[in-house]
């Protein structure tokens, strides 16, 4: 049975976040009789992809379809990235894959030149960071992902966006979910549910389980 860690812990007072803590939970659950087959951390393969703010967009001097962008990534100086995305605009907050970063399918992004102009990374679409655009309000794969255009960020202030510059994009998008695959045997029918597994986790890790109250009108 597959259980998202956040959901599993939501009925307990357990605070389990780090890789070491998750490993300990999996190990202890297995020892207690609820075997863990696999722990999958979604988005873990995405590395050095951060939130960037576009400060400037200029046409590439040697191309009629490329743009040269200056991006604030929270460093001392802006970085320059060349893109062919037609939806790029000044003020956009976007995922920027930096030099020597890893995006979906294990692809590595390196700094280089496009038509003779230095480019220190790549701005990303949903697909390029391994996400399904259909899971986000107004999400699409037509060009670069722009955070302000997504329904999930419609109520966010400029101060909020400024505060996430340079942060890893996956946690910002809430896509850093850890999923645990349990092998539940027929004699443990009580664990064929999130509530059952949650109770088992609380007992195993010496925490408290709180059963949700269901109100019927």
Regions picked out by a protein language model, each given a short descriptive name:
Residues 1-215:
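Phosphate-backbone binding interfaces of nucleic-acid-interacting proteins
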């Amino acid at each position: 049975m597959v259980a998202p860690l956040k959901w599993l812990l939501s009925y307990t007072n357990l605070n389990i976040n780090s890789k070491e803590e998750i490993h300990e939970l999996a190990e202890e659950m297995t020892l207690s009789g609820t075997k863990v087959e696999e722990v999958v951390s979604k988005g873990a393969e995405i590395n050095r992809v951060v939130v960037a703010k576009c400060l400037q967009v200029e046409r590439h001097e040697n191309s009629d379809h490329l743009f040269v962008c200056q991006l604030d990534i929270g460093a001392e100086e802006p970085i320059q990235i060349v893109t062919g995305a037609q939806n790029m605009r000044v003020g956009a907050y976007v995922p920027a894959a930096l030099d020597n970063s890893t995006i979906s399918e294990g692809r590595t992004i390196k700094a280089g030149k496009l038509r003779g102009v230095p480019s220190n990374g790549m701005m990303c679409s949903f697909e390029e960071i391994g996400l399904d655009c259909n899971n986000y309000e107004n999400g699409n794969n037509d060009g670069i992902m722009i955070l302000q255009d997504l329904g999930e960020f419609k109520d966010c202030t400029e101060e909020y966006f400024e505060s996430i510059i340079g942060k890893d994009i996956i946690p910002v998008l809430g896509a850093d979910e850890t999923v645990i695959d349990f092998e539940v045997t027929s004699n443990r029918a009580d664990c064929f549910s999130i509530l059952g597994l949650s109770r088992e986790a609380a007992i195993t890790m010496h925490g408290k389980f709180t059963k949700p109250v269901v109100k019927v009108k």
